[in-house]
């Protein structure tokens, strides 16, 4: 099989999916930086950076990157810096929904274990499929619905929530275990509710970006999201009494913050480009690759090897993802994808200009 045939049969028809897969790699890089900033064993507990403040720094750097990019490519980016007038209300809504998506995850982590919090966010692809069908009129086959369920089952094998697999005893517990997951039913209920609100926000972002399509440059979506999140996070840090502004105090922390901003910028650019080129339901399934990236970083950085359940879950996710990619869309959808690829004004090459 020649490279030309591979490009014609696999790369071009799945160009949007490839962009999404790469974008989630940069998202995983942000997660690693956040984890080190919050849980660095070399730092004292007083030196830990608040998650909302991490979000503030990350999004402010990302917004600065969007401004530099727009002015650097002013010939190909129209209506700088606010985008086309008819799309501005949708871009603002995209920023608001994007903030709810991020806030839901960060808030739930205060009271839920990481596994439970992540598991809830993976309800987003299924919700997106139904929203895209209801609001955008996009078709989705029974096989795609089955593929989403299979992928979700793989996530369950990796996350292994306690309400399905039971309590897993790992020696004597310390008094600080309540920090990992609260035992207060009311706090858990609030955390789950806010997390579900975040899921709705994530799914809404897919729908809004897909609705905007190519009517606005992809950088505008990133710009509005980062600006809205920066403003809201700054207000939270300034107005919430229990929070105070804490600057990084080492070159390592500054480097991690810089990686947060740059990776966030690249992630949002590729994510928007991928969503614009792929149906919302099929594209949202690529979020499951984040689980694979998480395992990769665990092994490389923290020397934590997956157990048998994790390997089984990875196999299920990879298999179902490949299955979805190779599913033949209807003749109508293939023509639409070809037209979208041929008329798009925003390509990866633009990032190199």
From Swiss-Prot:
The organism's superkingdom is given as: Eukaryota
What Pfam families is this protein classified in? EamA
**Which residues span the membrane?**
17-37, 52-69, 95-115, 117-137, 145-165, 189-209, 219-239, 255-275, 283-303, 305-325
**GO-annotated cellular components:** endoplasmic reticulum; membrane
**Location within or outside the cell:** Membrane
Question: Which ranges make up the Cytoplasmic topological domains here?
Answer: 1-16, 70-94, 138-144, 210-218, 276-282, 326-353
Per UniProt, the keywords (alphabetical) are: Membrane, Repeat, Transmembrane, Transmembrane helix
Domain EamA intervals: 24-160, 200-326
Side Extracellular, residues: 38-51, 116, 166-188, 240-254, 304
Task: Report the membrane topology from the UniProt record.
Answer: Multi-pass membrane protein
InterPro entries referenced in this protein's UniProt entry, alphabetically: EamA_dom
Principal place where this protein is found? membrane
This protein's name? Probable transport protein YPL264C
**Organism listed in the record:** Saccharomyces cerevisiae (strain ATCC 204508 / S288c) (Baker's yeast)
